[in-house]
């Protein structure tokens, strides 16, 4: 609050969804809405945070002039739970940082790769169990997993699986350049997320023209135009495991490089940055 009083901006952009305190000043407020997961997936966030999120976002929207969404899906779900958001000026533009600047030589080192947060919401439990089933069915590729460990039970599951199958490797947090090196050498990227607001890793992987295997969440269809391998997530846990194992055995290794390029170009930081710039500048000039 003190900094805002000193700076006196035309627009205050909050990069998170909720502003827990009421701000006072002669400036407009823009918030960023990434997802409605605390409402949609209470099992991952808990009942207390669900109540906190609903209560405080409703308060935040009363004082919000502009909304930046990361996807059309997020916009739809926000307006479903908070119809008042329909009356607030908004734009859909997800700015991706750390773009790929080096030209990597792609190879196939015979491994599946997952890089992301190590939690159930990202489908890591499904990935481990699906991979073990894939090996039971005769699959030969290795599995490399990277990402910050978030949950104790996932940590136990991963290390137990590594004891059972020496073809599973867990790398913990993966630095940016190492991640790109792994992308370049993988056979396919596996992203079995159970709840996703956008799915930035999929866009990153498309730069390498590698096959992608993902759950059939609607957001993945939105951002990829349907140009990836997907498996059915809307079934029992056992069926999910079987579905993932089967597609790991039989995924389409061919990639439509022109379709990938079109998706990558749509999410270039320069393009999305201009959308945000025009939105903010246009609002400031008209209000």
Which residues are covered by each model-predicted region?
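Carbohydrate transferase catalytic cores enriched for Leloir-type hexosyltransferases
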Residues: 1-287
């Amino acid at each position: 609050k003190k900094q805002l009083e000193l700076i006196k901006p035309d627009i205050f952009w909050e990069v998170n969804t909720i502003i827990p305190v009421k701000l006072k000043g002669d400036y407009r407020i823009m918030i960023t809405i990434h997802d409605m997961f605390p409402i949609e997936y209470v099992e991952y966030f808990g009942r207390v945070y669900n109540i906190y999120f609903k209560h405080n976002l409703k308060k935040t929207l009363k004082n919000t002039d502009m909304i930046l969404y990361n996807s059309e899906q997020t916009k739809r779900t926000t307006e479903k739970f908070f119809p008042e958001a329909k009356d607030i000026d908004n734009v859909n533009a997800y700015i991706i940082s750390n773009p790929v600047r080096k030209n990597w030589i792609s190879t196939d080192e015979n491994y599946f790769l997952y890089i992301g947060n190590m939690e159930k919401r990202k489908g890591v439990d499904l990935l481990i169990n699906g991979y073990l089933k894939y090996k039971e069915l005769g699959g030969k590729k290795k599995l490399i997993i990277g990402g910050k460990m978030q949950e104790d039970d996932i940590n136990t599951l991963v290390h137990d699986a590594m004891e059972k199958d020496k073809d599973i490797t867990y790398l913990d947090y993966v630095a940016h350049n190492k991640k790109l090196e792994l992308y370049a050498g993988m056979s396919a990227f596996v992203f079995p997320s159970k709840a996703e607001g956008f799915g930035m890793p999929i866009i990153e992987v498309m730069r390498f023209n590698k096959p992608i295997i993902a759950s059939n969440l609607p957001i993945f269809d939105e951002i990829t135009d349907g140009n990836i391998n997907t498996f059915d997530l809307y079934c029992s846990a056992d069926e999910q495991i079987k579905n993932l194992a089967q597609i790991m055995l039989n995924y389409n290794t061919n990639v439509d490089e022109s379709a990938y390029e079109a998706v990558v170009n749509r999410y270039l930081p320069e393009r999305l940055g201009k959308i945000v710039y025009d939105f903010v500048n246009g609002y400031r000039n008209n209000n």
